[in-house]
A protein has these predicted regions:
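Gly/Ser-rich helix-loop-strand patches that form or flank binding pockets
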Residues: 57-72, 101, 160-208, 289-331
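Residue-level detector of anion-binding/catalytic polar loops
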Residues: 25, 112, 147, 170, ...
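N-terminal positively charged helical leader segments and presequences
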Residues: 112, 122-151
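Small/aliphatic-rich secondary-structure junction motif
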Residues: 70-127, 197, 209-276, 284, ...
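A structural preference for short, hydrophobic beta-strand core positions in alpha/beta folds
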Residues: 115, 149-152, 204, 244, ...
Length: 331
């Protein structure tokens, strides 16, 4: 039977092998989660005692509701929840907007930014286009005086973003192609797949924002409650202003989820503006954002079972199509 010391030494070796193989700086806790994803629960059970002693709990993909919060919203040694931010770099204006947003957050949180440019086929690192992307990344990152590094990898975009997100705390990406409002389009949507399976919170960026006034879209669901917890953290640690909105089916509805949100925020002594309106949820949320001057949205991830979401759509899909401000997606 291996001792905790033996297991720890093996983990350190595995962490170094991963870092050498992929060229990424990987935290021990992220290496453990990588083992879970690769080899399943049986191997990870052997780590349980050591993990409880040394690292936050983590689990294999797909993440259960609340798993990220239990790992990141408890006090961490670094004193931050987004210590490392992954941002997809596509070499287009949309990708540079996503980088700008990641840099804004990194300055608030004192985070490191890791850009990832994914190439589907074979590539030459000395190619003119790649050199231009590297140069542009350095030019845009340098004025912020934070740790920023660009990685180049070959593979399928969705899979690589998911895998590398596990080694970071937040995934930031450009919002170029939101799911269209048709079942067949939703079924084929890579963005939908990314949001459903990503092990970390995601920030979809149509255009950058200073992120000073959040609109929390709250319906009382488990994932919306996770968004509520994150919103409370941002108020307390970033000093943002918070507005909470709920969409009701009709004006006679007896149950209003805002009561639960108000009770939680009051327990944390957090001030927020709360209101509800009747209508299609995505329309109510976008209208509230515009009227209240909010500069980003916080929302829970997909709430339906996959088949139901494909057939009937979701509030999140509507927001991804309609919002001109960043959307922070929690699960």
């Amino acid at each position: 039977e291996r001792t905790p010391t033996d297991l720890y030494l093996w983990l350190v070796k595995y962490q170094k092998e991963l870092s050498h193989q992929f060229g990424w700086e990987i935290k021990p806790s992220s290496a453990i989660e990588g083992l879970a994803a690769a080899y399943g629960n049986r191997l990870i059970h052997r780590w349980k005692r050591l993990k409880n002693q040394l690292f936050p709990m983590s689990s294999s993909q797909p993440p259960p509701v609340g798993d990220w919060r239990k790992t990141h919203l408890v006090p961490r040694k670094e004193g931050q929840i987004f210590s490392s931010i992954l941002v997809g770099i596509n070499g287009k204006d949309s990708g540079w907007r996503a980088l700008e947003q990641a840099l804004i957050i990194a300055q608030i949180e004192n985070s490191a930014v890791r850009g990832l440019h994914i190439i589907k086929g074979e590539f030459d690192p000395s190619d003119d286009q790649i050199r231009e992307i590297r140069a542009e990344f350095r030019k845009r990152s340098a004025p912020h005086k934070i740790s920023a590094k660009l990685y180049l990898e070959q593979g399928e975009v969705l899979n690589l973003l998911n895998e590398r997100a596990r080694w970071n705390d937040l995934l930031v990406f450009s919002l170029e192609h939101p799911p269209k409002d048709r079942p067949a389009a939703r079924l084929r949507s890579n963005l939908r797949g990314l949001i459903q399976t990503c092990p970390r919170p995601l920030l979809a960026v149509p255009s950058p924002s200073p992120m000073r006034h959040a609109l929390l879209a709250y319906d009382g669901s488990p994932k919306a409650t996770e968004a509520l917890y994150l919103a409370a953290y941002l108020v307390e640690h970033w000093g943002i202003k918070l507005t909470v909105v709920t969409a009701l089916e009709d004006s006679t509805s007896r149950h209003n989820p805002l009561h639960k949100a108000q009770e939680y925020l009051a327990s944390r002594e957090i001030e927020a503006s709360l209101f509800s309106d009747v209508g299609l949820p995505s329309d109510v949320i976008i209208s509230a954002m515009n009227k209240r001057g909010c500069d980003f949205i916080i929302v829970g991830g997909y709430g339906y079972q996959p088949v139901m979401e494909v057939l009937f759509g979701s509030t999140l899909n509507g927001l991804l199509r309609k919002s001109e401000k960043p959307i922070l997606i929690c699960h």
